[in-house]
């Protein structure tokens, strides 16, 4: 028996197209979920590339020594591939319209301490979303 709530629910998708009235104003995004990195550390890298062109963002990410830069670079490559294959856009004409990091679940570990006590260590996860648009739509 299917409940009323399950009938109306839409399936989750990692690739979405948002179109306004203008055909050039299309936004393509890619999402990576459950990444084993602290959202706070990943956000600092995401803030550096927001609003930049794709080629400039790749240069910034390749020069960064942080683990978060590798994770965001992978999501950005996926978003660019989505734009090229699904929307027939050139990678030269893309910029990062949105880039944000959400908190994911945490898993907890016990760290033994002195005198029979224990501390709980929280290992954090995050969800990274990168959306790209055509530069022609920006102006």
UniProtKB/Swiss-Prot annotation:
**One MF term from GO for this chain?**
structural constituent of ribosome
The UniProt annotation puts the region (Disordered) at 1-22
Query: Which UniProt keywords are given for this protein, alphabetically ordered?
Result: Ribonucleoprotein, Ribosomal protein, RNA-binding, rRNA-binding
List, as start-end ranges, the regions of compositional bias called Basic residues. 9-18
GO biological process entries = translation
The portions of this protein that span the membrane are none
Output the HAMAP family linked to this UniProt entry: Ribosomal_uL22_B (MF_01331_B)
The name this protein carries in UniProt is: Large ribosomal subunit protein uL22
| Organism this protein belongs to | Pseudothermotoga lettingae (strain ATCC BAA-301 / DSM 14385 / NBRC 107922 / TMO) (Thermotoga lettingae)
């Amino acid at each position: 028996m299917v409940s009323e709530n399950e009938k109306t629910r839409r399936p989750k998708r990692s690739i979405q197209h948002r179109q306004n009235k203008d055909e050039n104003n299309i936004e393509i995004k890619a999402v990576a979920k459950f990444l084993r990195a602290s959202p706070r550390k990943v956000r600092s890298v995401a803030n550096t590339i927001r609003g930049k062109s794709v080629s400039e963002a790749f240069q910034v990410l390749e020069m960064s020594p942080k683990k978060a830069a590798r994770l965001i670079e992978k999501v950005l490559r996926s978003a660019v591939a989505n734009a090229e294959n699904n929307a027939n856009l050139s990678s030269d004409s893309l910029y990062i319209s949105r880039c944000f990091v959400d908190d994911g679940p945490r898993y907890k570990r016990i760290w033994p301490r002195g005198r029979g006590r224990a501390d709980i260590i929280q290992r954090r996860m995050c969800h990274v979303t990168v959306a790209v648009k055509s530069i022609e739509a920006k102006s």
